[in-house]
Regions:
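Short, well-ordered beta-strand segments in beta-rich or mixed alpha/beta enzyme
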Residues: 2-9, 37-68, 101
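Generic beta-strand hydrophobic packing signal
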Residues: 6, 87-90
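Short, surface-exposed ligand-recognition loops at beta-strand->loop->(often short) alpha-helix junctions
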Residues: 9-20
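Short alpha-helical
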Residues: 13, 47, 72
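Residue-level signal for secondary-structure boundary sites
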Residues: 14-16, 60-61, 95
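An amphipathic, aromatic/His-enriched active-site/gating alpha helix that lines ligand/cofactor pockets
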Residues: 24, 28-38, 54-88
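Hydrophobic/anchoring residues in structured secondary elements
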Residues: 41, 89-92
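Short, low-order "capping/linker" segments at domain edges
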Residues: 91-102
C-alpha cells in the first residue's frame, strides 16, 4: 500500500474553484468506485491550504488518472497554486476506518 499526502496552498481567488474540482473528483470516484482507493481532501483553517490523502495499492496503478475530472483538476491546479505543492509518501502506522476497511 502507498499513501501520499499532498499539501497545496491555493491562490485566494481560486479556492472556490479548487473546492468545486475536489467535489467533481469525489463524484467521479463515487461513480467509478475503483477498488482499494481511499481519497480525502481537507481545507486547513487558513482557508487556502488543502491537504489531500490518497491511498493506492502498490501495483503501480493510479486509478484517479483514468478519471477526466481528476485530469482536469490536476491541469487547473498548475494555475491555482500560490506556491509549489509539497508531496510526501507516508507509512501508515495506525488507522481506524480512514485508510483500511474495518
Amino acid at each position: 500500500m502507498k499513501v501520499l499526502m499532498v499539501r497545496a496552498k491555493i491562490k485566494d481567488e481560486n479556492v472556490a474553484d479548487a473546492q468545486a474540482a475536489v467535489e467533481k473528483v469525489i463524484q467521479a470516484l463515487d461513480q467509478a468506485q475503483p477498488a482499494d482507493v481511499r481519497y480525502a481532501s481537507c481545507l486547513l483553517s487558513d482557508g487556502v491550504t488543502f491537504v489531500a490523502l490518497l491511498k493506492l495499492e502498490d501495483d503501480g496503478g493510479h486509478p484517479l488518472r483514468e478519471l477526466p475530472a481528476y485530469a482536469e483538476m490536476v491541469e487547473n491546479l498548475k494555475q491555482w497554486y500560490a506556491e509549489p505543492p509539497d508531496v510526501e509518501q507516508m507509512t501508515v502506522t495506525g488507522s481506524y476506518g480512514l485508510l483500511h476497511d474495518r
